[in-house]
Amino acid sequence: MAVVTWRWLPRAWAVGGLTLLAGTSVAADPSEIARGKLLFTTLQPACATCHTLQAAGAEGQIGPVLDELKTDADRVLRALRNGIGVMPSYAEKISPQDMQAVARFVAQATGAASP
């Protein structure tokens, strides 16, 4: 049996608590997911124009098939903010909250992790 001095307990609890917090994520609420789906199909240009995503009924012909890519929400956010390849940036077109909604919708629809 290990002997633990009282001085180390607060630090151990703090580190353990931070470890637990780092592994948790905030689930998107259903209204945010629904808004993300709507934006995916209605933005100009619409994500659905280029990307295939079964959950959105999208059969794009240009960009990656998101159902196969299974990209997480952070990667979708980076692509929306900065653009990637021929995909334009949406930073000047939609709010950060709307970008988050699209990112979480795509991550959930593909089974990828969501922040």
Enumerate the predicted regions with their spans.
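Hydrophobic alpha-helical targeting segments used for export or membrane insertion
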Residues: A14-V26
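Gly/Gly-Pro-rich "capping" loops immediately C-terminal to redox-active cysteine motifs
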Residues: K37-L39, A48-I84, S89-Y90
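Bacterial N-terminal signal peptides that target proteins for export
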Residues: A2-G16
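C-terminal capping alpha-helices of c-type cytochrome domains
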Residues: K93-P115
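Electrostatic cytochrome c docking/interface patches
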Residues: G23-T42, T110-P115
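Cys/His-enriched microdomains
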Residues: P45
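Residues within well-ordered alpha-helical secondary structure of globular protein domains
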Residues: T42, N82, F105-Q108
